[in-house]
């Protein structure tokens, strides 16, 4: 009743319950129901709003059209400006060439090769190269002192532009050579005009072409300009100064450009030139621009103009072209029609919405009722999940009491029948609590209450433990069960070891259940080394494929772990060997791991579980991850199970930040793979992880050499992986004769030969050489000089009969037979027995002497058990007393504080987490505070630092999720032990407090 009342109070505060109460207590109206009178007003508002939007659309489109019109005008204007500039540049180059001609043949040669007749004839015949020039002429530079001599020599009088005798000046520039079209310029002083004089002086000072301002040309009365180039009487230095240029100047070549004709010809060559109007200006004086072409009066569309710069080669003068459209832009009918169409469409939409609003008002009451029913259903579903998740502790507690009492009962004196009954009840209880745990885990996931731990753990040790769970079943079926972890995977990762173990256990358990021959292979590597398995493979078989599979060549020669075909064809020896080669390409594996720890905060691992079982029918593959779903009804009848394991595994994988997929082929097998994100543990893995999950493998085998004889390369690589974990150097041979050849002949001590200390022979390889061949190889070994270094012979077998065992002994395997699946700790224990190295010691999670070791640790120790449940106290006290401990009990945290007042004689305390009044966390915090106070008083009295009081406190919990590793450490606990007490868990919990640390063996 108390539990139900507690659940009821919790549900009353649930958001869905509150929502349901609000809806049932007060009927809520939606916006449309509450404002139905506003529907007509909203319709008018909609019309106004759509009219405004249509106006905005028209404006946007009209602006876009104007922008495009402006861009077109700019493009056309720039095109004309470039063409005018290019044609002008060509004519300028011809005038420059004429200036060089005069300089070369008139001044560089003596006597001159040019006279008026020659110049006139040459310029007339080459006039086609200067179509833009009305004429060219050459004016000689004459200083005042040379004027009289010049006039006598040429028989002329230097005149001004007005045809009058030129007055006395410092310098003159009379024309001596002229084209026939401008013959009227002969003897006229080109420097008689003020502007002309400045242009000529600027030309000789710069050595470049100069232009005059626009003026009316004689004869044509068109606007034009005069281009002037200096002519030099001697060659100039590479970089002449202004004085050198003026001194070397002998005359000037000039040409007149008819700008109006030039632009008219240019525009006539362009299509559509009537569309725009062009004006050319001299803007040297920006305040008073001079027109060179075009109408001075504004015509056309003056609202849009474009200016293009012109460069005629004279940096002093600036010119530009201004363009505008000949006609104004027409109305934008496209924008107008689009805006009107948009307005009409939106008006229709508004009318439809108005009608829909009226209809919604009518059906809103029905919708409100349906919504209320939906909330009720959701509240009931959440209440169910919340109830199951909340009572998980209460359900587990009596079950743990039953299992604990059965465990204590089995330690008493029982006859065979009683022991059989008790063992059967214990097995059924464990199966029941496992099923309860799965159902509660699913409920926690649905309720969103499942939390993941983040503690350091040894992933390889976890996988070895999973294999040990199914070792008996795999041996009974004759299955190859193996695990392989890439060297790139860190030794220690941060994550939830329990949930990781649960996922792998579910997948391996399913594989063992549905596999009758072949193998089950677990592989772990970094996700970057392998593309994830997708469901695309079985789609290929589904589309046109059959569920009947034909095995290749009898199905027992494929390069897989067992030789049977696997569902995922990528898991063959070639890809597996490539993965191993990638690992060995780098340097030492530990160096790689340290490097990875320095640059990455987390690592993504991919775990593949491959089997050669019955596979999954294609019709069931789409729903395989649904809860409580199996392939068909016959699966449950033949194999048992609830169909919830894969569903929970999928949820756990997603909580770990990964994905789970599979490839399955009926009668071939299945390959499940999942990825998961783990943190990288950067602290000292030995000192920190020993507290939780760390497999302390022996180091006494480092430096030993071994040969693995196995004809299956994948299986040999797995054996090599486990031996490498023990520090053994390994070579692989596919036959015993190859193993002998590895060591050479007649000289085992020769340099460079591989002298093995141990030879591991797979049972298959031994059976192949059973008829005397193996003994012959041994004799050959002895005859080849190995008589004093005969290695230890160890046989590896999945299962072996008594007859086969006797034959193995007679064949030379007198040392031992290791039964698979292989685990590093188990192999290490066997090697210690075979080689006689070291004493028996703890290997991973295996206790050296079973209950005797726990008894040796706990015998005579005074231990306090704190738990509010009397059954739990009796179970814990009984288990600890069975191991020789002196146990006292307390039923609450307050009672524990009273019993632990200093001084006390307790060696350890087992503390329950969930207790009334004061839970285990709060009790632990207060105990640690009492210890700090006692330590301070002791140190102050003694004057020196003594050993501090620290009572080992271990959390007792039936649900580790509520007592995570971080929470235990935060409140001061030293670890936890799960209920009910089992020897393995109890040994791990107390060993580090009561056992002296073993001395390390140097490698």
From Swiss-Prot:
Domain Histidine kinase: 390-680
Classification via InterPro entries: 2C_system_His_kinase, CHASE_dom, CHASE_sf, CheY-like_superfamily, HATPase_C_sf, His_kinase_dom, HisK_dim/P_dom, HisK_dim/P_sf
Residues at which trans-zeatin binds: 196, 218, 228
Major subcellular site: endoplasmic reticulum
GO BP: cytokinin-activated signaling pathway
Annotated binding of Ca(2+), by residue: 867-868, 912, 914, 959
Coiled-coil regions listed: none
Protein function: Cytokinins (CK) receptor related to bacterial two-component regulators. Functions as a histidine kinase and transmits the stress signal to a downstream MAPK cascade. This protein undergoes an ATP-dependent autophosphorylation at a conserved histidine residue in the kinase core, and a phosphoryl group is then transferred to a conserved aspartate residue in the receiver domain.
Stated name of the protein: Histidine kinase CRE1
Native species: Medicago truncatula (Barrel medic)
Protein encoded by which gene: CRE1
């Amino acid at each position: 009743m108390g539990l139900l009342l507690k659940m009821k109070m919790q549900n009353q505060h649930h958001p869905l319950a509150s929502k349901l109460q609000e809806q049932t207590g007060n009927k809520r109206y939606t916006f449309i129901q509450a404002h139905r009178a506003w529907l007509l007003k909203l319709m008018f508002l909609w019309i106004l709003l759509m009219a405004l939007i249509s106006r905005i659309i028209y404006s946007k489109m009209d602006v876009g059209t104007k922008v495009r019109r402006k861009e077109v005008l700019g493009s056309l204007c720039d095109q004309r400006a470039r063409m005018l500039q290019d044609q002008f540049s060509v004519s300028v180059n011809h005038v420059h060439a004429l200036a060089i001609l005069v300089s070369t043949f008139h001044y560089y040669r003596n006597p001159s090769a040019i006279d008026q007749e020659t110049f006139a004839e040459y310029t007339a015949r080459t006039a086609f190269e200067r179509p833009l020039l009305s004429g060219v002429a050459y004016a000689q530079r004459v200083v005042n002192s040379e004027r009289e001599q010049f006039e006598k020599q040429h028989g002329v009088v230097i005149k001004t532009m007005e045809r009058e005798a030129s007055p006395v000046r410092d310098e003159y520039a009379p024309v001596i050579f002229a084209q026939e079209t401008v013959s009227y310029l002969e003897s006229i002083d080109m420097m008689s005009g003020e502007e002309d004089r400045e242009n000529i002086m600027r030309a000789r000072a710069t050595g470049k072409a100069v232009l005059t301002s626009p003026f009316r040309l004689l004869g044509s009365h068109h606007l034009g300009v005069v281009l002037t180039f200096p002519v030099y009487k001697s060659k100039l230095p590479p970089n002449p100064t202004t004085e050198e240029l003026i001194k070397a100047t002998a005359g000037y070549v000039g040409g007149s450009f008819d700008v109006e004709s030039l632009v008219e010809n240019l525009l006539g060559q362009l299509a559509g030139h009537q569309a725009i109007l062009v004006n050319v200006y001299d803007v040297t004086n920006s305040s008073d621009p001079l027109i060179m072409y075009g109408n001075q009066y504004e015509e056309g569309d003056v609202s849009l103009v474009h200016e293009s710069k012109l460069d005629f080669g004279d940096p002093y003068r600036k010119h530009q072209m201004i363009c505008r459209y000949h006609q104004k832009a027409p109305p934008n009918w496209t924008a107008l029609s689009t805006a009107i169409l948009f307005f009409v469409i939106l008006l229709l939409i508004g009318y439809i919405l108005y009608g829909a609003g009226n209809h919604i008002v009518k059906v809103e009451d029905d919708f409100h009722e349906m919504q209320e029913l939906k909330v009720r259903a959701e509240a009931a579903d959440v209440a169910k999940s919340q109830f199951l998740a909340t009572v998980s502790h209460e359900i587990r507690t009596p079950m743990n009491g039953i299992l604990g009492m059965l465990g204590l009962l089995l330690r008493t004196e029982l006859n065979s029948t009683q022991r059989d009954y008790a063992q059967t009840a214990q097995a059924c209880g464990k199966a029941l609590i496992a099923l309860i745990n799965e159902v509660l885990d699913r409920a926690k996931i649905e309720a969103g209450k499942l939390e993941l731990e983040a503690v350091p753990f040894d992933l390889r040790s976890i996988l070895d433990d999973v294999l040990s769970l199914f070792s008996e079943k795999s041996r009974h079926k004759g299955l190859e069960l193996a695990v392989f972890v890439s060297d790139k995977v860190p030794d220690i990762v941060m994550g939830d070891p329990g949930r990781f173990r649960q996922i792998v256990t579910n997948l391996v358990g399913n594989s063992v259940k549905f596999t009758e021959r072949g193998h089950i292979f677990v592989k772990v590597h970094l996700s970057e080394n392998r593309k994830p398995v997708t469901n695309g493979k079985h789609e290929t078989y589904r589309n046109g494929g059959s569920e009947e599979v034909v095995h290749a060549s009898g199905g027992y020669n494929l390069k897989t772990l067992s030789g049977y075909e696997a569902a995922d064809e990528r898991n063959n020896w070639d890809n597996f060997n490539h993965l191993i080669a990638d690992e060995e390409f780098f340097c030492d594996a530990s160096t790689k791991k340290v490097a990875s720890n320095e640059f990455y905060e987390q690592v993504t691992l991919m775990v593949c579980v491959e089997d050669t079982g019955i596979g999954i029918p294609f019709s069931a593959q789409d729903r395989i991850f649904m809860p409580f779903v199996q392939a068909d009804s016959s699966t449950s009848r033949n194999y048992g199970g609830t169909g919830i394991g894969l569903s929970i595994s999928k949820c756990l994988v997603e909580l770990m930040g990964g994905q789970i997929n599979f490839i399955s082929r009926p009668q071939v097998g299945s390959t499940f793979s999942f990825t998961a994100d783990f943190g990288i543990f950067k602290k000292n893995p030995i000192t920190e992880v020993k507290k939780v999950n760390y497999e302390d493998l022996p180091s006494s085998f480092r430096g030993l050499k071994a040969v693995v004889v196995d004809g299956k390369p994948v299986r040999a690589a797995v054996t090599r992986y486990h031996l490498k974990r023990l520090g053994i150097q390994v070579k692989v041979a596919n036959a015993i004769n190859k193993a002998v050849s590895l060591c050479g002949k007649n000289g085992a001590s020769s340099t460079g030969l591989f002298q093995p200390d141990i030879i591991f022979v797979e049972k298959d390889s031994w059976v192949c050489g059973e008829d005397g061949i193996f003994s012959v190889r041994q004799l050959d070994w002895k005859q080849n000089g190995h008589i004093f270094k005969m290695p230890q012979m160890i046989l590896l077998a999945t299962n072996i009969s008594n007859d086969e065992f006797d034959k193995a002994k007679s064949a030379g395997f007198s040392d031992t037979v290791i039964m698979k699946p292989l685990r590093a700790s188990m192999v290490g224990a066997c090697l210690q027995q075979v080689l006689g190295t070291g004493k028996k010691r703890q290997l991973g999670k295996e206790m050296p002497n079973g209950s005797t070791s726990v008894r040796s640790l706990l015998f005579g120790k005074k231990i306090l058990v704190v738990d509010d449940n009397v059954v739990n106290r009796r179970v814990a006290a009984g288990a600890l007393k069975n191991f020789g401990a002196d146990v006292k009990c307390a039923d609450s945290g307050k009672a524990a504080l009273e019993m632990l007042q200093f001084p006390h004689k307790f060696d350890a305390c087992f503390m329950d987490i969930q207790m009334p009044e004061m839970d285990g966390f709060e009790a632990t915090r207060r105990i640690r505070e009492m210890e700090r106070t006692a330590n301070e008083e002791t140190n102050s009295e003694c004057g020196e630092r003594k050993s501090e009081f620290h009572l080992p406190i271990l959390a007792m919990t039936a649900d580790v999720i509520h007592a995570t590793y971080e929470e235990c450490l935060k409140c001061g606990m030293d670890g936890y032990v799960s209920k009910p007490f089992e020897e393995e868990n109890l040994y791990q919990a107390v060993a580090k407090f009561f056992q002296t640390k073993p001395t390390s063996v140097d490698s």
